[in-house]
């Protein structure tokens, strides 16, 4: 996970990049944490070293949109990693799950929190307490995935197409859009609407707001300056 965080932070700082796609192989999206490594830890080890805290860096520090393109297995930490991304696309036969209960523990990298927010308490409770897996089609039907695809290739291509679309817009507006949607998860509707309005107003201080609205009025394609 350290290597992934390092790469994402570098891409986040690269001004030529507007959005990112995170994917694995056709067989598996991500393997999750090392169970053999975990099996030797006690409470002092896990708590003292903030075990798997690094898994929280992606949603907390990356400002550009990240799209997960999930094929194959996404279990445990792999499922949590997919849910950390801003948009989740998946193959209809992708295999999701939080099987930690079978190991005598629970999800530790946000699985219980993000899954509950996405699909509701009852379904999340069922999945986490039974350790049952669910398919990519289920993920889409339940609202966890934004899109579902018939083949692994279509999954990756679809994610790349969306990333290219996002990258074609003003970096400032995209960053603001991600910020306000994420903020909606942390506060009530009244506070969220007020926060959104403040961020909306702030964009009127950008060059891109002038460029975008003038281009619309003149029926031209905007040439963003990203400032």
Regions inferred by a protein language model and the residue ranges of each:
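Glycine- (often His-adjacent) and acidic-residue-rich active-site loop
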Residues: 2, 6-9, 13-16, 23-61, ...
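C-terminal long alpha-helix characteristic of the crotonase
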Residues: 2, 10, 89-94, 136, ...
């Amino acid at each position: 996970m350290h290597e992934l965080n390092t790469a994402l932070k570098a891409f986040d700082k690269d001004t030529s990049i507007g959005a990112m796609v995170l994917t694995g192989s056709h067989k598996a999206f991500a393997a999750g944490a090392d169970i053999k490594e975990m099996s030797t830890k006690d409470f002092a080890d896990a708590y003292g070293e903030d075990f798997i805290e690094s898994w929280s860096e992606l949603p907390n520090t990356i400002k550009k949109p990240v799209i997960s393109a999930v094929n194959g297995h996404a279990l445990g930490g792999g499922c949590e990693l997919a849910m950390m991304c801003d948009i989740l696309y998946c193959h209809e036969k992708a295999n999701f799950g939080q099987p930690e209960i079978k190991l005598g523990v629970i999800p530790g990298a946000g699985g219980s929190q993000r899954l509950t927010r996405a699909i509701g308490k009852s379904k999340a409770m069922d999945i986490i307490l039974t350790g049952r897996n669910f398919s990519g089609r289920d993920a889409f039907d339940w609202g966890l995935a934004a899109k579902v695809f018939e083949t692994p290739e279509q999954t990756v291509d679809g994610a790349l197409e969306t990333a290219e679309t996002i990258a074609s817009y003003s970096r400032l507006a995209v960053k603001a859009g991600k910020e306000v949607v994420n903020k909606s998860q942390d506060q009530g509707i009244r506070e969220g609407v007020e926060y959104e309005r403040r961020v909306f107003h702030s964009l009127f201080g950008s060059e891109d707001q002038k460029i975008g609205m003038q281009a619309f009025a003149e029926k031209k394609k905007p040439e963003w300056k990203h400032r």
